[in-house]
């Protein structure tokens, strides 16, 4: 069983920034990364990566000291801004006119973004949303330890926005020794429910941790998804066995590498196990169906500090009249109703109501209502 690792804590709201003149503007990705670095969500990282750690993560999926880390957490700035900065300086980190933190600059370097795209996303295709975002962001990286000096005020989900130290406390309060984490950016459909409940048979608690940071424009909005999770948990899950809290990070769509990243982060939130399903964190056809599971064979459970639980693609079988997978169902593909978040989105956008084999009625009602609201605001 994994041992609970120590959490980084770089939050200090009493930190005096009044004498610091220089500033770096943060985009939404860097802002959410700043919070997760400070609250320990990205432990053992204490700041944005310097060149040595960046190169090591891109090339080997490890930090320079050998610890497993698969996604480069970087602070991009323009060449103009970079020219005004010096190693050793302390600089304010700002967004929307607010100072949210400071960085002690340890490194300023120009990355090879094509190499980063190829190794992290396995493609340089700009149609890939992660690659597109990588190329759109400024071209110089600033590395160094950070301090979060101001918490976010206009948090859309305050009651569900818990730091890792708080989720750990919640699990402890419930007496959960084993907790399985589930990452999602989609409404939970019946295949997800089947997988989650299968995992719940072997652990004490389920940590449903939907990502609510920046996602693709055609992903269902976070507020609609949160309402869909609430109605699902109220009606179909044992209340004392499930805990819902948001993951405020941006989606990278980095497939296999992001699966490792998501597992490491959930370890920090207090999970002992992590669900990895079909095409985890994938997009389009960039990654193989089970590539995000296969990547875990490169690491031991001990060095990850969390146990991955792999699930095959599940479906509704019309002959079994139940959710199943190829491990539990003998029938052919003609009897299988394949479920996916993409399929649910497609049906809804075409004005069709997903059948009960796809999604719970209460969830569908929330999604239809949310979609109508979206159409009106457009």
From Swiss-Prot:
Pathway(s) served: Sulfur metabolism; hydrogen sulfide biosynthesis; sulfite from sulfate: step 1/3
Reactions listed under catalytic activity: sulfate + ATP + H(+) = adenosine 5'-phosphosulfate + diphosphate
Enzyme class, UniProt record, top EC level: transferase
One matching Pfam family: PUA_2
One function term, GO molecular function aspect: sulfate adenylyltransferase (ATP) activity
Enzyme Commission no: 2.7.7.4
Signal peptide span: none
UniProt KW ATP-binding keyword: yes
Keywords: ATP-binding, Nucleotide-binding, Nucleotidyltransferase, Transferase
Record-annotated membrane-spanning stretches: none
GO annotation terms (biological process): hydrogen sulfide biosynthetic process; sulfate assimilation
Family indicated by similarity: Belongs to the sulfate adenylyltransferase family.
Protein name: Sulfate adenylyltransferase
Taxonomic lineage: Bacteria, Bacillati, Bacillota, Bacilli, Bacillales
């Amino acid at each position: 069983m994994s041992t609970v690792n120590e959490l980084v804590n770089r939050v200090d709201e009493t930190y005096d920034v009044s004498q610091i003149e220089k500033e770096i503007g943060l985009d939404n990705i860097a802002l959410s990364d700043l919070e997760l670095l400070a609250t320990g969500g990205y432990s053992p990282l204490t700041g944005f990566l310097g060149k040595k750690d960046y190169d090591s993560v891109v090339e080997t999926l490890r930090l320079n000291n050998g610890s497993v880390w698969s996604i480069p957490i970087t602070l991009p700035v323009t060449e103009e801004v970079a020219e005004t900065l010096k190693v050793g300086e302390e600089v304010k980190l700002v967004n929307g006119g607010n100072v949210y933190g400071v960085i002690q600059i340890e490194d300023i370097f120009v990355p090879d973004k094509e190499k980063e795209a190829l190794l992290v996303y396995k493609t340089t295709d700009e149609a890939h949303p992660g690659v597109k975002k990588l190329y759109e962001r400024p071209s110089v990286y600033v590395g160094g330890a950070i301090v979060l000096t101001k918490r976010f005020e206009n948090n859309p989900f305050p009651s569900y926005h818990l730091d890792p130290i708080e989720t750990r406390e919640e699990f402890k309060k419930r007496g959960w020794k084993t907790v399985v984490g589930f990452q999602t950016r989609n409404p939970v459909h019946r295949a997800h429910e089947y997988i989650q409940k299968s995992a719940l048979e072997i652990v004490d608690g389920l940590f449903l941790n939907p990502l609510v940071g920046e996602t693709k424009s055609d992903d269902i909005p976070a507020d609609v998804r949160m309402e869909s999770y609430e109605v699902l948990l109220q009606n179909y899950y044992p209340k004392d066995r499930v805990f819902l809290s948001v993951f405020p990070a941006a989606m990278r769509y980095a497939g296999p590498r992001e699966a490792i990243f998501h597992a490491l982060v959930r370890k920090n939130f207090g999970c002992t196990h992590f669900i990895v399903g079909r095409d985890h964190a994938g997009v389009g056809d960039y990654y193989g169906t089970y590539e995000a599971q296969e990547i875990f064979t490169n690491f031991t459970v001990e060095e990850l500090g969390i146990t991955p639980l792999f699930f095959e693609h599940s479906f509704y079988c019309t002959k079994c009249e139940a959710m199943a997978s190829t491990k539990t169902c003998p029938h052919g593909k003609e009897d299988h109703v394949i479920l996916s978040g993409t399929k649910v989105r497609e049906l809804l956008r075409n004005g069709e109501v997903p059948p009960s084999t796809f999604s719970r009625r209460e969830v569908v009602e929330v999604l239809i209502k949310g979609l109508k609201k979206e159409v009106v605001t457009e």
